[in-house]
Amino acid sequence: MPAFWLAVWLFRSGRWPNKSGADTLVNKLIRDFALNEKEKQQLFDMTIPKGIEGVLFQQNPCSDEEILDLLPPAPDSKPQRGGALRQLELEAIGPTKSLTFNPADRLTIVTGDNGLGKTFLLECAWWSLTGNWAGRPATPRLDADKTEPKIKFQITGKGLASQRKTTIQYNWEKQAWPLLKGRPTIPGLIVYARVDGSFAVWDPLRYTFPQSQLLRPEAALVFSREEVLDGRPEHIEGLIRDWTKWQHSPDQTVFEKFKNVIQRLSPPEEAPLMPSASVRIPGDPREIPTIRHIYGDVPFINESAGIRRIVTLAYLIVWAWTEHLVSAALAKIAPERKIVVLIDEMEAHLHPKWQRDILPAILDVAALLDPLVDAQIIITTHSPLVLASVETRFDSESDSLYHLNLTKNGEVSFVEIPFLRLGSVDDWLTSDIFELKQARSREGEQAVERAKQILAEEAPSKEELMEITGRLQMSLPPEDIFWTRWAYFLERKGIRL
């Protein structure tokens, strides 16, 4: 046991003379506990870390969390399980020079323009949780100093150990991020839906060594769109085979969960998506599952991109949970109750009616797996309909909204912003998140903005009034609410439409 660090923890709140040093702490430990030479030799490591003197004593005492960041973990300590992402700090990587992200317990929504780092943030979140990159590893910014690039994260479970933060410094010589060997908290089950149609899955029970805490290379499985459909040997059977297997199994438990999840994620105002009888199609020896529509059954491989993405998400969530239960049963331990779901561009391929319903449905999926499952959901979106959809579900105690924005000086900012109920989707479009001046076409927006400028002028010319009226007629429909204001203004100037 390191005597120095034990003394730091035990005496962290004490007051010390100005000339105190590291040996002062260790000597106090020896005196207070009356340690003899034999006890010191057999029970303690009496060495003092190098470079500690300059930061050991300060005016204000450190918090327990700050001290835990410094303390090395006990060599025989076992990691806590069932963690979720509590904090992610990025320095000198990605579009922002520095970024601090504190995901909420239940739902976190990330918005922002293209190219500002939403996908990059999810990739770093996945890496922090699993220790593996789902795609290309993040690289330092071109303007980064040698000591700058680092990723700092905190995965929380229960207890003090889960409050520890982990810092990974970029290795310039190896051009890589060092692998983390062991961590105080292991995350729960994770499913990551990437925007290119691929998926990544992490299961701590299947892919960790409980004794050594070393993460196996296959700890995080990343499946291409084709592998999710057709399988990968020794890892996943694939949607086609698993769906058919579940559907024809004497035990319908898994298939019922799958059907329930699909139905909850179905597009609104239509008949729920329902699995139908599998069929054979030319050139394929397999039984292909189908989905029942009002107009008939459709083989899954012929479905629309939107239906394929949502049904595939449902499949991966159910598959990951089912495999987790199998692994827990084989290991004779209780299954995890924490699931982390990452979804990039939640609205991809979905009709506006479906965009307005999909996120509330995602919030309900965990309970369909098991009423005791607790989910942390982190999504990115460009859609005002997705934000409007959770106005009645958003809880500031358990949910958060973050926004990436390009500032006037050309830097990317990342801030948490209050979630406001704006009601109309038009109001969301013209909010600070989406930054449209008008919820119209670009030509209509420009015409209305110019008309507003003329409204503020004292004596606009008749030619200007007729010119802008023509632009408004070209870009606005007759029932547009702006016409009432403009017609009244023209009448005051002696012009009738």
Question: Can you annotate each of these PLM segments?
Answer:
Residues 1-69, 102-107, 131, 184, ...:
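Acidic, Mg2+-coordinating catalytic modules of nucleic-acid enzymes
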Residues 24, 31-34, 50-133, 286-428, ...:
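Switch/communication elements of ASCE P-loop NTPase nucleotide-binding domains
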Residues 66-68, 72-73, 149-151, 246-274, ...:
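Long, acidic, intrinsically disordered low-complexity segments
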Residues 123-178:
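Conserved P-loop NTP-binding catalytic core
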Residues 142-145, 179-188, 251, 281, ...:
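A general structural signal for short secondary-structure junctions and capping/turn motifs
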Residues 143-147, 279-285, 407-409:
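Short, ordered beta-strand-loop transition motifs
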Residues 169-269, 425-433, 437-452:
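Coupling/switch segment of ABC-type P-loop NTPase heads
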Residues 270-290:
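Long, charged, glycine-rich C-terminal linkers/tails
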